[in-house]
UniProtKB/Swiss-Prot annotation:
Protein name: Acireductone dioxygenase
Similarity-based family: Belongs to the acireductone dioxygenase (ARD) family.
Residues reported in the UniProt entry to bind Ni(2+): H99, H101, E105, H144
Superkingdom of origin organism: Bacteria
Enzyme Commission number, as recorded: 1.13.11.54, 1.13.11.53
Site (May play a role in transmitting local conformational changes): D104
Pathway field: Amino-acid biosynthesis; L-methionine biosynthesis via salvage pathway; L-methionine from S-methyl-5-thio-alpha-D-ribose 1-phosphate: step 5/6
Protein species of origin: Exiguobacterium sibiricum (strain DSM 17290 / CCUG 55495 / CIP 109462 / JCM 13490 / 255-15)
Cofactor note (record): Binds 1 Fe(2+) cation per monomer. Binds 1 nickel ion per monomer.
Amino acid sequence: MATVLFQKTNERYTDQNEVSAFLASRGVLYEQWDVSKLPAELVDTYTLTDADKQTILDTFQSEITDVSERRGYQTADIISLSDATPNLDELLVNFQKEHHHTDDEVRFIVSGHGVFAIQDDEVGYYNIELNPGDLISVPVNTRHYFTLQEDRKVVAVRIFVTTDGWVPIYEKDPIETAN
């Protein structure tokens, strides 16, 4: 279950009703999907073959189809990051640059953990700390960045409006990220 950490105050929301209400008030879609149906051999597996990735997509196809039909998404893929990922640190540098997209940024956490830090005019930056089973959709044109938690591992389903995939728009100088 996700938590929300406010970077300015270090206040943290852990109650799921509070988390859901806050994210909804910011236009962030938040859902929880059942990860217990993931095949046992893929739980906490971060080096994935193409067949493994397809198995994950197939396992969650009904959920992917449901959210896609509701929100106009067209395609999905799998990203897996861990210390075994070539050039992990360079990838994280790109993800940690503040950016936005011309479509929603949708992620479902299958294994591991991730953090989306979202810029908000009212509360400043807040971190959405994601765990297995959490799905979020960062709204179009919302400034944010992504990083990993201390375990430096995540497997996520990425869902896109177009087949262009992840297309960041950088407009500002890099910011110092806070976890």
